[in-house]
Amino acid sequence: MAIHGLVKNNLVECVSSTTYQAASGGGAKHMRELLTQTGKIYNRVDSLLAQDSSNILDIDSKVLDTQKNFSGNEMHCFKVPLAGSLIPWIDQDRNDGWSLEEWKGDVELNKILGSDK
C-alpha cells in the first residue's frame, strides 16, 4: 500500500477509511429486496418522469414518501429502505462501537501494514 512508507516512518497518526458494500454481496434475497423497492418507487413516479414539465421536487417528495411507507416485508433484509439510500452501518454490531465489517477492515489494514495496533 502507498501509505506503508509513511506509517513505517511514524508520519501517520490516524487513517480513516470508508467502504461501500453492494446489496448483491448479501445474495439473491438482498438483490430481490433492492429491485422490489426500486420498482415500487418507479411505479409511484413514472407518470411524472414522463412529463418534462413536472417539478423535480414533487417527484422527490413522492420518492421519499414511498420509502417511508415501505412495509416490513419490503425491508426484511436491511430493515431500512435500501433503494435510493446509503446505509451507514452494515453487518453485525460488535457492541464495542464497531460493526463487524469495520473491525475486519481494521484488522486487514493492520495485517497488511505489519502493525500490531
Residue spans of the language-model regions?
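Active-site-lining helix/loop region of Rossmann-like oxidoreductase modules
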Residues: 1-117
